[in-house]
From Swiss-Prot:
CDD domains: CHS_like (cd00831)
Organism phylogeny: Eukaryota, Viridiplantae, Streptophyta, Embryophyta, Tracheophyta
Entry's EC annotation: 2.3.1.74
Similarity comment: Belongs to the thiolase-like superfamily. Chalcone/stilbene synthases family.
Originating organism: Medicago sativa
GO MF annotations, alphabetized: naringenin-chalcone synthase activity
Name used for this protein in its record: Chalcone synthase
GO biological process: flavonoid biosynthetic process; polyketide biosynthetic process
PROSITE patterns reported for this sequence: CHALCONE_SYNTH
Reactions catalysed, as given in the entry: (E)-4-coumaroyl-CoA + 3 malonyl-CoA + 3 H(+) = 2',4,4',6'-tetrahydroxychalcone + 3 CO2 + 4 CoA
Enzyme class: transferase
Function (record text): The primary product of this enzyme is 4,2',4',6'-tetrahydroxychalcone (also termed naringenin-chalcone or chalcone) which can under specific conditions spontaneously isomerize into naringenin.
Inducing stimuli: By infection.
Length: 265
């Protein structure tokens, strides 16, 4: 491991990157990147950063870790912030890790997915849509009522930017790994793009089993999809399809897009 990226909502000094380096016995000169308080879009952010590091540092192997303790936002009901109850109902704790590299060593390294293209954007007129604040009361969480509408309104533009160069305009022909911010977001995205219900099956399965684990969610969904694809006897890790998309949505409102290519099983 040459590089380490850690993403978490917790705050310690030295950070979790230091603790992991010691715990795993990594070399003391491993290049560490610590990302705090990024929120739900950061599962895409860590992959984008890892891709850049792997492509621009020959032989790099990047360990990516997302560890989220969203229980720190839990508190009693507030008359002034009823929206906090939404997050408390949806959130869950979770951690996931993967390794990113380029030029895999034949017969030794077996990639599961290939990252082809990445992007990050701020949705127009979305300031204050999702907020988190670290205050005396702890980490507070607030969101506007129309977050699902903002996401669904902007997702088509992100898809066109990502897939037009590949000649893909049928979004039922690709596999989907979308951050499961909540059922309402998934419902509106499905409706906006006329997606078949099975497109979000892996995403909804993770939301149902574990809740919204912030940045860790999309990594859980990647794992869920590749395992289910193998169990069902499909040809690729992406539900038998070649191309797919990974979306992260979070504070900002920030949207992360990753174009994925599956691998033959």
């Amino acid at each position: 491991i040459t590089h380490l990226i850690v993403c978490t909502t917790s705050v310690d000094m030295p950070g979790a990157d230091y603790q992991l380096t010691k715990l795993l016995g990594l070399r003391p000169y491993v290049k560490r990147y610590m990302m705090y308080q990024q929120g739900c879009f950061a599962g895409g952010t860590v992959l984008r950063l890892a891709k850049d590091l792997a492509e621009n540092n020959k032989g790099a192997r990047v360990l990516v870790v997302c560890s989220e303790v969203t229980a720190v936002t839990f508190r009693g009901p507030s008359d002034t912030h009823l929206d906090s109850l939404v997050g408390q109902a949806l959130f869950g704790d979770g951690a996931a890790a993967l390794i990113v590299g380029s030029d895999p060593v034949p017969e030794i390294e077996k990639p599961i997915f290939e990252m082809v293209w990445t992007a990050q954007t701020i949705a127009p007129d979305s300031e204050g849509a999702i907020d988190g604040h670290l205050r005396e009361a702890g980490l507070t969480f607030h969101l506007l009522k129309d977050v699902p509408g903002i996401v669904s309104k902007n997702i088509n533009k992100a898809l066109v930017e990502a897939f037009e160069p590949l000649g893909i305009s049928d979004y039922n022909s690709i596999f989907w790994i979308a951050h499961p911010g909540g059922p309402a977001i998934l419902d509106q995205v499905e409706q906006k793009l006329a997606l078949k219900p099975e497109k979000m099956k892996a995403t909804r399965e993770v939301l149902s089993e574990y809740g919204n684990m912030s940045s860790a969610c999309v990594l859980f969904i990647l794992d869920e999809m590749r395992k289910k694809s193998a169990q069902d006897g499909l040809k690729t890790t992406g539900e038998g399809l070649e191309w797919g998309v990974l979306f992260g949505f979070g504070p900002g409102l920030t949207i992360e897009t990753v174009v994925l290519r599956s691998v033959t099983i």
